[in-house]
């Protein structure tokens, strides 16, 4: 299980300072939509200069198939290590993205977003007319069959996804509160033990790390636990 630290701070300077504090740790860094729109592709280069971090660019691409493929191709030129697209874009979009990225000698991992961890059952059903688990199983089967590398999901769906695909089909699980911190805007949250028991391959932790007075110590504690 790998730790992915979310760089969801207010300024680029704060993000870079956090990255410097976490040098030489076996972690990934997650760059989200806010940071990417604010700081651009050069921010990725600056992070790589701090240390040879693995970068997950979390933009949740969702559009018509050709536009998604164009976007993923441009993102892949940045040298990031993992990207994500929305599973609800459908299998044609998945096929076009994976075909386009196949020309790269080293392409990023491509994960499909299933059900955002900000959803609870009631809100999810009001949109999709399905239970979360039913939709996630369907999304994961389609994603696996069309060559994606894994899914973004809550801890509660991670093991189920692997049961319906393969053990090596990756799961990245946001909403991790490692030591029982408050949920904030997440609905389906979990701790480290739950992530381990449900076979998560990547856990995403943000606020519990960067809001602590000693982020490196918290990261080291999490790494010891996993």
Curated annotation (Swiss-Prot):
Its EC number is 4.1.1.23. The keyword Lyase applies. One of its GO terms (cellular component) is cytosol. Belongs to the OMP decarboxylase family. Type 1 subfamily. This is Orotidine 5'-phosphate decarboxylase. The keyword Metal-binding does not apply. It comes from Campylobacter jejuni subsp. jejuni serotype O:23/36 (strain 81-176). Pfam families: OMPdecase. Gene3D superfamilies: Aldolase class I. PANTHER family: OROTIDINE 5'-PHOSPHATE DECARBOXYLASE (PTHR32119:SF2). Transmembrane segments: none annotated. Pathway: Pyrimidine metabolism; UMP biosynthesis via de novo pathway; UMP from orotate: step 2/2.
């Amino acid at each position: 299980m790998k730790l992915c630290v979310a760089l969801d701070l207010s300024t680029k300077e704060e993000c870079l300072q956090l990255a410097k504090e976490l040098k030489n740790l076996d972690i990934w860094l997650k760059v989200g939509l806010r940071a990417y729109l604010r700081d651009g592709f050069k921010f990725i280069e600056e992070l790589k200069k701090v240390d040879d971090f693995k970068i997950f660019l979390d933009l949740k691409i969702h559009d018509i198939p050709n536009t998604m493929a164009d976007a993923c191709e441009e993102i892949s030129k940045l040298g990031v290590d993992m990207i994500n697209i929305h599973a609800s874009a459908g299998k044609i979009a998945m096929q076009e993205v994976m075909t386009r990225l196949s020309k790269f000698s080293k392409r990023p991992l491509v994960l499909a977003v299933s059900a955002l961890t900000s959803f609870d059952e009631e809100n999810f059903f009001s949109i999709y007319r399905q239970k979360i688990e039913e939709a996630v199983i369907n999304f994961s089967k389609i994603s696996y069959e069309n060559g994606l590398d894994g899914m973004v999901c809550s801890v509660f769906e991670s093991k189920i996804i692997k049961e319906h695909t393969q053990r090596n089909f990756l799961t990245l699980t946001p909403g991790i509160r490692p030591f029982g911190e408050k949920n904030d805007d997440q609905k389906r949250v979990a701790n480290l033990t739950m992530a381990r028991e449900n076979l998560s391959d990547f856990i995403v932790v943000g606020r519990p790390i960067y809001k602590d007075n000693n982020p490196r110590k918290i990261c080291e504690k999490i790494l010891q636990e996993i």
